[in-house]
Amino acid sequence: MPIRVPDELPAVNFLREENVFVMTTSRASGQEIRPLKVLILNLMPKKIETENQFLRLLSNSPLQVDIQLLRIDSRESRNTPAEHLNNFYCNFEDIQDQNFDGLIVTGAPLGLVEFNDVAYWPQIKQVLEWSKDHVTSTLFVCWAVQAALNILYGIPKQTRTDKLSGVYEHHILHPHALLTRGFDDSFLAPHSRYADFPAALIRDYTDLEILAETEEGDAYLFASKDKRIAFVTGHPEYDAQTLAQEFFRDVEAGLDPDVPYNYFPHNDPQNTPRASWRSHGNLLFTNWLNYYVYQITPYDLRHMNPTLD
């Protein structure tokens, strides 16, 4: 699926070097087809890096995807140039009267922060409430899963004693589930979080269907039966080097982090890691776009909410 982005977005050249099909707005305007409108609420500090990761995964299908980047934190960013944010991101007020086929809410490094202490917690709640009437399907990633479970289901914050970091094995629970179509019975995915997601908690306090979990009973992928919301507790979008960058950052900060599990060859941080989760990550996003967005979204987005012109 060619992703449709502004001509000047840095990701255009970055992804083209990887032979990823990126369609600029100027070229897309010549195609008579309604693109899927996907809104990305980017909560990660290094926004350009995160853009590249998610856009890569949204690029593999024959339809256009029109990407809109959203920010809700008005504080000055220490990791992303203000010019980039001003040129490529919108505020909630800019899109609150629009409808979207899909919404992706990224993770955020807030695992040890109480929800009410998050600077933009009221804005998160506002976006999630808004999405019920304005978005066909929403995909929550890592910390956003924890936030959504609290806002939508009232589940208290669950925090691990030690950070979960590494590449872990998961198994699918329903072989014919659409979101895991094409997955191997067992697959690998990276995690980097303090948030805890016991599968038993999800089963006991929600009506969500768990689609994949670990042997230890940690939920990895779950969704609502109507396909309106889906949750992935890991980071399938991560590059091969992302966990290494986080590890060495924490080492330099004097935090004495554990070496990420099942990641560095021979468990030696001096060895170059290889991504073992790319195929599953691509399948997950392709399946979400196809079965949870494209297959159920109205052709005319105004029909999602008849009060909108």
UniProtKB/Swiss-Prot annotation:
Keywords: Acyltransferase, Amino-acid biosynthesis, Cytoplasm, Methionine biosynthesis, Transferase. It catalyses: L-homoserine + succinyl-CoA = O-succinyl-L-homoserine + CoA. One of its GO terms (cellular component) is cytoplasm. Pathway: Amino-acid biosynthesis; L-methionine biosynthesis via de novo pathway; O-succinyl-L-homoserine from L-homoserine: step 1/1. CDD domains: GATase1_HTS. Its main location: cytoplasm. Substrate binds at residues 163, 192, 249. Its EC number is 2.3.1.46. The active site is at 142 (acyl-thioester intermediate), 235 (proton acceptor), 237. The record marks 192 as: Important for substrate specificity. One of its GO terms (biological process) is L-methionine biosynthetic process from homoserine via O-succinyl-L-homoserine and cystathionine. The record marks 111 as: Important for acyl-CoA specificity. One of its GO terms (molecular function) is homoserine O-acetyltransferase activity. InterPro entries: Class_I_gatase-like, HST_MetA, MetA_family. It is found in: Cytoplasm. Transfers a succinyl group from succinyl-CoA to L-homoserine, forming succinyl-L-homoserine. HAMAP family: MetA_acyltransf. Belongs to the MetA family. Homodimer. PANTHER family: HOMOSERINE O-SUCCINYLTRANSFERASE. This is Homoserine O-succinyltransferase. It comes from Escherichia coli (strain ATCC 8739 / DSM 1576 / NBRC 3972 / NCIMB 8545 / WDCM 00012 / Crooks). The gene is metAS.
